[in-house]
A protein has these predicted regions:
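Asp-based, Mg2+/Mn2+-dependent phosphohydrolase catalytic module
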Residues: 1-17, 38, 45, 49-50, ...
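Asp-based phosphoryl-transfer active-site loop
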Residues: 8-28, 327
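Gly/Thr-rich phosphate-binding beta-strand-loop-beta motif of the actin/hexokinase/Hsp70
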Residues: 16-18, 25, 130, 320, ...
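Conserved Rossmann-like nucleotide-cofactor binding loop
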Residues: 22, 125, 273
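Metal-dependent phosphoesterase signature
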Residues: 25-42
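Short amphipathic alpha-helical segments
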Residues: 28-30, 70-73, 130-133, 232-233, ...
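N-terminal loops that bind phosphate or other acidic moieties
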Residues: 152-502
Length: 502
């Protein structure tokens, strides 16, 4: 995304920026100062000029050999020096990030308290310097304009914004699809559920024929669960972080399936317990390092749950703005079938034993233990009326983010293909928060986890595939992408009987 930034970030007076990797291309280490040629990253100059009327700007950068004057001379070459009210280098303050002195000095020069400042950077040390100074931080994963948009959305409440923009599916487009199918060169109803899918796509997008999705993307949200330590899974929690790294290296099942069907994979750290640094290809939106053990009490606070909902909504909105026209849900989190079962039981008022499955293949003893934990956790939600309170009590960060992802897809009239039991739990949360949100979704497949079928039944969704999958990651939903594309293509490219007579 290289578009300009057009609005202020609520609660922020000063925006501080790292330089190398954030404003300009990172120079090769050891390059002599005299040989440095600043090359602005795409959209940076335009974005800074659009931002300047709304916020005071400054830069905080690590360099062992350049003082403020030398750095400003380089920035003047790309026309942004005049926009920066303060430029602080590690050479000037005698400390590199994550030491907060550079951030604090920039805030002092600009006359603002650190809690009213936002630092934007591309490295883990930038994030840690902001935290140590008490400032906000956003990673420049997808360009400066995108980082600013995410910062603004998170301050305003991206989920609430998306929820307010959701409208009912288009009944006229649905009827137009039915009418067109009746005119196509085939017996009425002979394409079976493919016709139903075409009608649904028309209603979701508000267009008949519906657009043929050409840029599908799988949003894989990763988070850890305190309940994983309670004996509900044979896998160690560290597997979550290892799999996130595997996704980044494109070596996981979802990467292979996505390549086959022409989809992009976007991985988001919303709550992995381990510090992942700033791995390339990962969006770093960690709300907290994993949830607490839901066997002992609430998995998280309602503030955590709402923050994760915002993350999902922000990511979906950004992906749609980048031109993606089909959203697919994916996830990773050791132990996450336990909170999913708890959410499904609580939100569908189904007996926990009926929705709790074997997850990664646990034995009978572990299943009985897992079911007891789910039963006790669900009992704590009996008096809750607010779905966010239920989500906070027994849910997960990646599940919350998926719920936000789904709602933002609906807000943008983009179809969302949901995956297995984790995604079904997220969709139940989304549907409890925004009426009839499931109308905007397509069930990609039926997971072999028992809770998935119960959730789909309550949501009124019939899955496109039933391959006895239980991996997650978005694999089943991703496999359904060609079917979704075909349903739209049929409405575009089949001739009508009237056209045959011409």
């Amino acid at each position: 995304m290289t578009g300009q930034f057009h609005d202020a970030i609520p609660g922020i007076d000063v925006v501080l920026l790292d330089i190398g990797g954030t404003l300009v291309e990172q120079a090769v280490p050891g390059t002599p100062v005299g040989a440095l040629v600043p090359r602005p990253l795409p959209g940076v100059v335009e974005t800074l000029r659009a931002l300047a009327p709304h916020h005071r700007l400054g830069a905080v950068t690590d360099t062992a050999v350049m003082d403020e004057a030398a750095v400003r001379a380089l920035l003047a070459q790309i026309g942004v020096d005049d926009l920066l009210g303060a430029v602080v280098t590690s050479c000037d303050v005698g400390a590199e990030k994550p030491d907060p002195r550079g951030v604090l000095e920039a805030c002092r020069r600009l006359g603002v308290a650190p809690e009213r400042a936002l630092l934007i950077g591309d490295r883990a040390v930038d994030r840690d310097a902001a935290a140590n100074a008490g400032a906000a931080f956003v990673a420049v994963d997808r360009g400066l304009a995108d980082a600013l948009a995410r910062a603004r959305a998170s301050r305003r409440g991206a989920f609430a914004d998306a929820a307010a923009r959701v409208t009912p599916c288009d009944a006229d487009a649905f009827a137009a699809s039915q009418a067109r199918h009746a005119q196509l060169t085939k017996p009425a109803g002979s394409l079976g559920r493919l016709e139903d899918l075409g009608h649904r796509l028309a209603a979701i997008t508000g267009r008949c024929p519906p657009p043929i999705p050409t840029r599908p993307v799988v949003g894989v949200f990763a988070g850890d669960h305190g309940v994983a330590r309670a004996g509900v899974t044979p896998w160690p929690q560290d597997i979550t972080a290892a799999m996130v790294a595997n996704f980044a290296r494109r070596g996981a099942a979802i990467n292979a399936v996505a390549r086959q069907v022409g989809a992009t994979v976007q991985v988001v750290d919303v709550g992995v317990a381990r510090d992942l640094g700033l791995i390339d290809g990962i969006l770093h939106h960690k709300v907290r390092p994993g949830t607490d053990d839901l066997a002992l009490g609430p998995a998280m606070t309602t503030a955590d749950a709402r923050a994760a909902l915002d993350v999902g909504a922000e990511v979906a909105t950004s992906l749609v703005a980048d031109g993606h026209d089909l959203l697919v849900t994916g996830e990773m989190g050791i132990g996450n079938t336990t909170p999913s079962a708890a959410l499904i039981a609580a939100l569908t008022h189904t007996a926990p034993a009926a929705v709790t499955g074997r997850g990664t293949g646990i034995d009978d003893g572990m299943l009985a233990h897992k079911t007891k934990i789910v039963t006790n956790a669900v009992a704590r939600t009996d008096t809750y009326l607010d779905p966010v309170s239920v989500l906070a009590e027994v849910g997960g960060l990646e599940i919350a983010a998926l719920a936000g992802f789904i709602v933002a897809g609906a807000a943008n009239n983009v179809p969302v293909v949901v995956d297995g039991v984790i995604a079904c739990a997220a969709l139940l949360v989304a549907d409890a928060l925004v009426a009839n949100i499931a109308d905007h979704c397509i069930a990609g497949h039926r997971s072999s986890e028992p809770g998935a079928s119960i959730a789909l039944g309550c949501l009124g969704l019939a899955p496109l595939l039933d391959l006895e999958l239980r991996l997650g990651e978005g694999t089943g939903a991703c496999l359904a992408i060609p079917i979704v594309q075909t349903a739209a293509r049929v409405l575009h490219e089949m001739a009508t009987f009237d056209e045959l007579e011409q």
